[in-house]
Swiss-Prot record:
Disulfide-linked positions: none
Coiled coil regions in record: none
Gene Ontology annotations of biological process type: queuosine biosynthetic process; tRNA wobble guanine modification
Pfam assignment, any one: Queuosine_synth
EC category name: transferase
Annotated localization: Cytoplasm
Catalytic activity of the protein: 7-aminomethyl-7-carbaguanosine(34) in tRNA + S-adenosyl-L-methionine = epoxyqueuosine(34) in tRNA + adenine + L-methionine + 2 H(+)
Pathway the protein acts in: tRNA modification; tRNA-queuosine biosynthesis
Described purpose of this protein according to its UniProt entry: Transfers and isomerizes the ribose moiety from AdoMet to the 7-aminomethyl group of 7-deazaguanine (preQ1-tRNA) to give epoxyqueuosine (oQ-tRNA).
GO molecular function, one term: S-adenosylmethionine:tRNA ribosyltransferase-isomerase activity
Protein name, as recorded: S-adenosylmethionine:tRNA ribosyltransferase-isomerase
UniProt keyword annotation of Transmembrane helix present: no
EC number of the protein: 2.4.99.17
Amino acid sequence: MQVSDFHFDLPDELIARYPQEERTASRLLKLDGNNGNLADGSFKDVLDLVEPGDLVVFNNTRVIPARVFGRKASGGKLEVLVERMLDEKSILAHVRCSKSPKPGTKLFLGENDEYEAEMVARHDALFEIHFTSDQSVLEILNSVGHMPLPPYIDRPDEDADKERYQTVYNEKPGAVAAPTAGLHFDDKLMADMKEKGVEFAYVTLHVGAGTFQPVKVDNINDHHMHAEYVEVPQEVVDAVAAAKARGGRIIAVGTTSVRSLESAAQDAVKNGTELVPFFGDTEIFIFPGYEYQLVDCLITNFHLPESTLIMLVSAFAGYDNVMGAYDHAVKSEYRFFSYGDAMFINKKTS
């Protein structure tokens, strides 16, 4: 398939620049992957769509304030966007400035040059930066960093984004983009789901800035995914086995939860084992033709045209069904992307 097969026209006014006042106030488009049937609703309908015995899998990554402004020792301004933390003192990052810094270049970060760092090495498009200040990377980012809103939101971050560009169940710092399907859940909805007899499990995938990078090839088979760190612990393995045994569905909240679960499943297939814990980088690329191993239902936002994420969803529910759903969503003026509306999708099984 060609990347252009996943194109759709999206009016600029349908890109959500701010979240709804309440997390659960978003709209929800329901898609049956077996027949393409659509139903419009509200995100609160999720409570009616889940059943006792289902297992809902969330990504508990926490978004770090990964965008930092500063200058080079020569005085030139720069912007650093963390891709991932390497250790307590070092990061891999995208750097925007008039002239790329060379190894050994001193950097001063923060509005008042609060922190000093050094550019150590370049790895393709990414720069390895080591902080020479006493504080850890996380302490520095929490002090002078900004929330890394996606480029299509096209506004400076605000104080409210520190809460709203973060799930209510976030736990492990490391993401530089939110697992956006999870932004719709609030404490009440999750408590109501628990009361109904729904089980929860938590994977971790630290979303990288690469999630916003355009696919630069024509044929999707030629695309190579960026690496992201994943944790699928023993508790998740046990919860999946228990849900399958009782006939419950595995419902993934977001494409990051899907990629975490399916990475563990692919690893098990490769090693000829049952599902086991998975800790490490994944470069899994899911597109039409992929056979899902674990996930039965998917809750996800509306994704960018020609992105790897709309390809993943198309593999889950069928290409024609998904493109038809997106056409309906545009005509029905759903809100798109990170702060936008969501879908609840049953997997195509036939």
